[in-house]
Amino acid sequence: MAEQKSSYGYEELLACGRGEMFGPGNAQLPLPPMLMIHRITEISETGGAFDKGYIRAEYDVRPDDWYFPCHFQGNPIMPGCLGLDGMWQLTGFFLGWLGEPGRGMALSTGEVKFKGMVRPHTKLLEYGIDFKRVMRGRLVLGTADGCLKADGELIYQATDLRVGLSKEGSAQ
């Protein structure tokens, strides 16, 4: 496993997407264009809203991002599910960063609220993920609350984001 750091740059996130960070058969991020994170600015096993750990990350929005021309023609908006997926990506990354084994999968979320939109003129998305618990059993399960800000304005909130890591189904 890679050295546990408190922040990660884009090239390191790409290495995670290639399966080079946490070892074979363990957590990895998707590669572009599905990677919804450009950098992790802070990650800690303690602190956050529930004092169970947190992760903060950013994504630079570009007017030519792949989703704008197709969602929707004449009214470009980033699909809300991509922001939600970014929250799940970070939740899974956190579990791998803790050294937990297995491949990640988004399992569920409690409540999701969309209060705003990401448009081509948006510059910066900021993710905040605060962990409520990490359960370690046959399946490692992380539960967290998340939020997404667009240029400093809160636009998405999600409660009880759940991501599991499982050794079953891992490609060997």
UniProtKB/Swiss-Prot annotation:
The active site is at H71. One of its GO terms (biological process) is unsaturated fatty acid biosynthetic process. Keywords: Cytoplasm, Fatty acid biosynthesis, Fatty acid metabolism, Isomerase, Lipid biosynthesis, Lipid metabolism, Lyase. It is found in: Cytoplasm. Its EC number is 4.2.1.59, 5.3.3.14. It comes from the Bacteria. Gene3D superfamilies: Hotdog Thioesterase. Pathway: Lipid metabolism; fatty acid biosynthesis. It catalyses: a (3R)-hydroxyacyl-[ACP] = a (2E)-enoyl-[ACP] + H2O; (3R)-hydroxydecanoyl-[ACP] = (2E)-decenoyl-[ACP] + H2O; (2E)-decenoyl-[ACP] = (3Z)-decenoyl-[ACP]. GO terms for molecular function: (3R)-hydroxyacyl-[acyl-carrier-protein] dehydratase activity; trans-2-decenoyl-acyl-carrier-protein isomerase activity. It holds the Pfam family FabA. InterPro entries: FabA (IPR010083), FabA_FabZ (IPR013114), HotDog_dom_sf (IPR029069). GO terms for cellular component: cytoplasm. The keyword Ribosomal protein does not apply. Necessary for the introduction of cis unsaturation into fatty acids. Catalyzes the dehydration of (3R)-3-hydroxydecanoyl-ACP to E-(2)-decenoyl-ACP and then its isomerization to Z-(3)-decenoyl-ACP. Can catalyze the dehydratase reaction for beta-hydroxyacyl-ACPs with saturated chain lengths up to 16:0, being most active on intermediate chain length. Belongs to the thioester dehydratase family. FabA subfamily. Homodimer. This is 3-hydroxydecanoyl-[acyl-carrier-protein] dehydratase. It comes from Brucella ovis (strain ATCC 25840 / 63/290 / NCTC 10512). The lineage of its organism: Bacteria, Pseudomonadati, Pseudomonadota, Alphaproteobacteria, Hyphomicrobiales. The gene is fabA.
